[in-house]
């Protein structure tokens, strides 16, 4: 009897972890966008007016729980919880629930960035949160939950990142470290996540997962409710989990400890794609991209060119400030069939702490758009760049096809097909790419969705005529505005 019960428990745990890798996308949609620091009302409108019509699959939203108020309102104050009340500068619980419903109604899922590792860092005296809740972080007193000192690990600093105890039980940059093995802490975290599930979210990005023991997270995840069928989720659907685990290789706490619980952020993807498109590694080597580079298996990897943290760091990672290379890297990211793709939507920043666009009263302001739909008032909105949203459409059009017809010039010019549905060419050399290449597409004329669109039967940008053998003449000049060209069957004239 014991053996049968143990086997049943292991089978259930395995099926739950497998289910937590499913992002619950509509139809052929398969790209998430991180609308970093957007207000809930603005996200709802964006789902209805842009993301849904353009085929985006989901939105990662900023933390929803009450946070500390820090001088100047830096973005990172959102990562210092005071309570689990759903009131932030992005809006209140009613506005959040309205956003989730409206986005689900147009096929755009919502994934919440959640903070299970810690509460706020030290604050002199009494801290007041965005919902008006008082706390004394220095005393580990958070009555809005409530948490007291006994709910936290003993105070210590991470000085050795190769020491598992320090990484998982000491304070990450001074943030008060919760004890996830505590029944009370577990119950409050599960209650918080279940409330979000009740409101209709599809899953969670788990911040600082590396700093929590995988067995504690497994208990929390397995205790969560199924997704809310009133929001279009099938019966018995499990929340999609993707976990922030920074692992550059040879880490004491490894990404592999978390990959069976849900997807894991593949930070090496971000670093290596930046290296390649900055010219530090020839694009020809990208033919074996993915597991061939030592990355996680595709279904366990959350992939991105940059995220809200590493876009602010020096190094290989690309961001919006290098637009030509960034758009090429993003095009490759969305064209190559590896990983669960997320694109970034940023606001402009001059330093690490720059707050989101705000008014004189420190209220987040709504994005404004020019006649082309681009953001103009401090929001970057990379997801509204034609070269990026067009590749979201490309990714949808070629879903479930494989790489064929790889070509390269032995250096930084590459092309490949996605079955007989799509074709991508990139020129990252300082000389032109001008060549007849195999597009693998049926005979006809196709619009390049990078330089323009198919409108009323005509291309507003470049076009390529494909002959009966699948070949077309491809030209990407070294000084062209964009170093990439993309064709797919849904952009055939």
Curated annotation (Swiss-Prot):
Documented EC number(s): 3.2.1.1
Disulfide links within the chain: 47-103, 156-170, 375-381, 417-440, 447-459
Residues that hold Ca(2+) according to the record: 117, 168, 177, 211
Residues recorded with modification Pyrrolidone carboxylic acid: 20
Gene Ontology molecular function, alphabetical: 4-alpha-glucanotransferase activity; alpha-amylase activity; metal ion binding
One GO term (biological process): carbohydrate metabolic process
Annotated effect of mutating residue 324 to R: In strain: Isolate SIM2
Record keyword Signal present: yes
Enzyme class at the top of the EC tree: hydrolase
Site positions (Transition state stabilizer): 309
UniProt catalytic activity: Endohydrolysis of (1->4)-alpha-D-glucosidic linkages in polysaccharides containing three or more (1->4)-alpha-linked D-glucose units
Mutagenesis or variant effect for residue 50 to L: In strain: Isolate SIM2
Keywords: Calcium, Carbohydrate metabolism, Chloride, Disulfide bond, Glycosidase, Hydrolase, Metal-binding, Pyrrolidone carboxylic acid, Secreted, Signal
Quaternary structure annotation from Swiss-Prot or TrEMBL: Monomer.
Protein name per UniProt: Alpha-amylase-related protein
Organism: Drosophila simulans (Fruit fly)
Gene field: Amyrel
